[in-house]
Amino acid sequence: MLLLIQYTILFASILILVALGGCFSERSGVINLGLEGIMVMGAMGGALTMRFLPADIPAILMIVSVMLMSILTGLIYSALLGVAAIHFKADQTIIGTALNMLGLAAATVIVKAINIAANPDDVSSNVQYVEEKKAFIVNIGGFEFNWFMLTTLIILVAAYITLYKTKFGLRLMACGEHPQAADSVGINVYKMRWAGVLISGALGGLGGIVYITAGVSEWKFEYGVAGFGFLALAVMIFGQWKPWKIALAALLFGFFRALSNVYFGFEFLVDLNIPSGIYNMLPYVISLIVLAFTSKHSRAPKAEGIPYDKGTR
């Protein structure tokens, strides 16, 4: 049971981070379907940082360095969405799809190139971080507390305060609801949308490194992040683009994802002889069912996905 709780919180943390990233972007008026690719790039930045940093450096320095590099990589990669969607006013759905494909391919090629440079016989896309990963975990009475859990809680609270209690957040949401009205009172819609996209990239990149360090000590980048970017979008929609509802939705989906990892620890589930693949499918099937019943009542930001043209005010 303790292991189930541990994995539920860890997987929920990933979904909260990435879904909050999508929330900031869409609240500003830009649809970010490229969260999957951003997660992969953020994961690559963090994993390579763990690989090249000395394993014996202070744990706090390891944690901060990996987090910052993941955030920076995700932020830089999301700038591609900003340039295409905000500056060139391109179709945001197509851009997001392209970012997902490019992110996976680019990360695989970069990691393979680094591995080949270090060892010509190593053509894999693997990055190992067995010792480095220990810096992120503290054992508390059999419960493996991950520092990313605390980080996620802090970011969740900060996201709520930012969106609802600050001028920046209120202006950001105004740009996603009625950009013409926001512009008429002096708000720079383009800057607000850029801010939303870059925050989305930063949180998506951080979610990527949390994902690949959840329970494993190496990662093969050609596998991507198993659709977690899309699952985070479902969490965001189910959570009605509101931080606290997103957190509750993430816990629900995180529970079903965790169950696929630890079901063998529950005798009554093992006795059912259900194939493991069914448990792996659960979070995605649940997301389809939930969205089918709740999508009619979802209220997305009115101007999301619509390029802003100041001349049409």
Regions found by a protein language model. Give the residues of each.
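Transmembrane alpha-helical segments in multi-pass inner-membrane proteins
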Residues: 217-284
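Membrane-interfacial amphipathic/re-entrant helices at transmembrane-helix boundaries
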Residues: 1-19, 31, 45, 54-65
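Cytosolic-side transmembrane-helix boundaries in multi-pass membrane proteins
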Residues: 159, 177-184, 188-191, 263-313
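Helix-loop-helix "hairpin" substructures at the membrane interface of multi-pass membrane proteins
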Residues: 141-220, 244, 248
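Transmembrane helix-bundle core of multi-pass membrane transporters
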Residues: 103-165, 268-278, 298, 305-313
